[in-house]
A protein has these predicted regions:
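C-terminal domain-boundary segment and adjacent tail
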Residues: 159-171, 225-256
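N-terminal pre-catalytic segment of deacetylase/amide-hydrolase enzymes
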Residues: 5, 10-43, 48-57, 249
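Hydrophobic, well-structured mid-protein blocks that either form specific transmembrane helices
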Residues: 117-166
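Hydrophobic faces of well-ordered beta-strands that scaffold small-molecule active sites
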Residues: 41-45, 65-67, 90-94, 137-139, ...
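Active-site beta->alpha N-cap acidic-glycine motif
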Residues: 34-104
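His/Asp/Glu-enriched short active-site or ligand-binding loop at hydrolase and phosphoryl-transfer sites
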Residues: 158-202, 249-252
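Alpha-helical scaffold elements lining the catalytic groove of polysaccharide deacetylases
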Residues: 105-106, 110-129, 146-150, 179-212
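Catalytic beta/alpha-barrel core
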Residues: 48, 66-72, 138-148, 163-174, ...
C-alpha cells in the first residue's frame, strides 16, 4: 500500500536505475537514468504476505523478479514459501509509520518514531528472522520514518549488518534515505517516478513498454492495486521486451 493512493486508480511505480557498463552500485550511491541505451529491467512486486489476488499468476511468470513480502501479516509464511518454490527473490516490505495514514494501517509491528533505536533495530531484525533469506528491504508506507534521520539510521544499521540494499519508495519528497544510507554504508535504490493506471491490461502494458525505453526497476503489486491485471500485462509484454534486447534481473542484481 502506498500513501498517495488516488481513489479508484491503481498505480504502477517505476524506479529509475541504470546499470552502466557493468559498474557496481557502491554503498550509498544512487545511479539515475541519463538516456543510456536500455540494458536491464528489474521488477519488484509489493504486498506479498496477504495471499492477495494475482499471487498465483505473478509467481507463474517465467522471468526473474523480486517479491516484496510483508513480514508480519496473516499470510507471510504461506506467501514466502510460495515465492521460494517459484524461485523468486524475496525482499522485506517493511511497514513504517506514515505522516498521513492511520497507525493501524501500518500494523502493530511496524517501525514508529516513538520507538527508541534499540527497539527499531530489534523490530527490523525480527523481520529478518521471519524472512531470513531476504535479499533486501523496501518501505511499506513510511513517509514519517523516511524523514526522520534517527529512526532511519537505526533501520540502516541492521541492513548494513546484513549486507543488503534498501529501496526507497519515495513516499515523501523530503526523504533522507539517500543521505542516511550513504552515512551508514548501505546501497540505496531510489524511486524515480510514479505512473498511474486503470484496470486496463493494455494501459499497464504500455507502462511496461515505457520502462523498456530506459532501464528501470518497475514496481507493481499483488492484491487490489494490481494483481492479475499486472501479472497478465507482464506475461504478455516480457517477450516483446526481451526481443528488444532487455534482460530481466532481480533487484539485488542491480545493487551488486
Amino acid at each position: 500500500m502506498r500513501e498517495n493512493i488516488k481513489t479508484g486508480i491503481k498505480y504502477l511505480a517505476l524506479f529509475g536505475m541504470c546499470f552502466l557498463g557493468g559498474r557496481s552500485l557502491a554503498a550509498g550511491q544512487t545511479v539515475r537514468v541519463d538516456g543510456e541505451k536500455p540494458c536491464r529491467l528489474a521488477i519488484l512486486i509489493d504486498d506479498f504476505g496477504y495471499c492477495g489476488a494475482g499471487t498465483e499468476e505473478m509467481l507463474a511468470l517465467s522471468i526473474p523478479f523480486t517479491a516484496a513480502v510483508m513480514p508480519f501479516s496473516s499470510c507471510t509464511t504461506e506467501d514466502a514459501e510460495r515465492v521460494r518454490q517459484a524461485g523468486k527473490e524475496i525482499f522485506i516490505h517493511m511497514p513504517m509509520e506514515s505522516l498521513t495514514g492511520k497507525r493501524e494501517w501500518v500494523g502493530e509491528k511496524g517501525v514508529f518514531r516513538d520507538m527508541d533505536d534499540a527497539a527499531i533495530r530489534e523490530r527490523v531484525k525480527e523481520a529478518f528472522s521471519v524472512l531470513p533469506d531476504a535479499a533486501g528491504m523496501n518501505n511499506h508506507m513510511g513517509s514519517a520514518i523516511m524523514e526522520d534521520a534517527r529512526s532511519l539510521s537505526a533501520v540502516m544499521e541492521v541492513l548494513k549488518e546484513k549486507g543488503v540494499p534498501f529501496v526507497d519508495s519515495m513516499t515523501t519528497a523530503k526523504s533522507l534515505g539517500k543521505a542516511v544510507a550513504a552515512e551508514k554504508g548501505v546501497a540505496l535504490l531510489e524511486r524515480d517516478v510514479f505512473l498511474d493506471s486503470t484496470d486496463s491490461v493494455e494501459v499497464v502494458k504500455e507502462h511496461l513498454r515505457k520502462a523498456g525505453e530506459v532501464t528501470l526497476i518497475a514496481i507493481g503489486h499483488v492484491g487490489p492495486e494490481g494483481g492479475k491485471i499486472t501479472a497478465q500485462a507482464i506475461k504478455e509484454v516480457a517477450p516483446e521486451l526481451e526481443r528488444a534486447g532487455i534482460t530481466f534481473v532481480t533487484v539485488s542484481e542491480l545493487a551488486k
